[in-house]
Amino acid sequence: LVVGGSTGAVKVNNAVRAILPELLKKYQVVHLCGKGKTDASLNGIDGYIQFEYISDQMRDLFAISDIVISRAGANAICELLALRKPNILIPLSANASRGDQILNANSFKEHGYSSVMTEEEITPEKLLAAVDDLYKNRQKYIDAMDSSPQSEAVDKIMALIKDCSK
């Protein structure tokens, strides 16, 4: 699953498209490109589907995904941690943001939850190597997320809701 955020991520989209033939030898790719950023020439390629944006079916896409390439916004990283999805985070650059995504990504990398690439270092070759490495080592990332103090947060919240509803 490739998620570039609601507006898409041109550098990520371009890098994914450049390595698509190689990716499709091993993986099926669901690509959320951003509004107006799909590429009609790629429609109908076996193993690849692209959307501008998905909202209601996002949970289903996360459920079927083994790995995720994503921006590093607060909502995205919380979902990735809660769902234990091995991921490559590509934060918005400091020039295009307040820098919060960079802080989020670095924190997740330090905890062993994520692999991180900056926009400036993305090349098709580096992205392909990062995807292959993430997939090969995905259990390491899942184990790190399982050991997170936040790993039981959903269970604790559900227990509180049940207690309050009695």
Where are these regions (language model features)?
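A short, well-ordered alpha-helix in the C-terminal region of glycosyltransferases
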Residues: 139-151
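Short, hydrophobic alpha-helical segments
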Residues: 131-139, 161-166
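Conserved sugar-transfer catalytic core signal across GT-A, GT-B, and GT-C glycosyltransferases
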Residues: 57, 76-79, 83, 104
